[in-house]
Amino acid sequence: YNGGAAFGAMGTEQSKGTKVFALAGKIKKGGLVEVPMGMTLKEVLYDIGGGIKNDRKFKAVQMGGPSGGCIPADLIDTPVTYEDINKTGAIVGSGGMIVMDEDTCMVDMARYFLNFTRDESCGKCNYCRIGTKRMLEILERITNGQGQDGDIEKLEELAAKIKDGSLCGLGQTAPNPVLTTLRYFRNEYEDHIYNHKCTAGSCKALIHYTITDACKGCTACARKCPV
């Protein structure tokens, strides 16, 4: 029988033991994995998870569930410890790891997670109940091609107030997906707002096709057209 001493012998000085993570998303081998604390994200995603599906380019991993944060590819060597993950703006949380490839729109991903936390708000405090709703409205406008100058600053302002004023952990962490995507993928927000362009090709309202003179009117393309 191995007790607490054996468990504490694994991991790092500040983050001892092991942690179970749920690998999901654009990963070749998803599922539940138990790893010693201190293993890097790269080791978890590539040595255990087998890498990105269809050998696409790794873009980010969302850690900590819907109120966690997105960690970009250039931080893939970050050790999986509570303190190191916190430094990125994400959290270890319940152990969720949602992997994203180059075809993932980070603005739409932030909208998706915020929609969940907005729905889960108990409604007791105004900061969470109304603040997350206002943030979601801005994100929906941006992904629908109706972003405005000042939207990014408004998102940051609302996020700060929600984190400071919410009564419980849900509201205090709800803005994390937005804040981390703004921190690491701000250019995608700017592309959506100012260039009306979704580089990942995920936001249908920002996809535009031009019919050239070469078109014969066969309608074959209509079966594949996403808009």
Model-derived regions, located:
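Redox cofactor-anchoring modules in respiratory/redox and cofactor-processing assemblies
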Residues: 1-208
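Iron-sulfur cluster-binding cysteine motifs and their immediate structural context
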Residues: 127-133, 210-211, 220-227
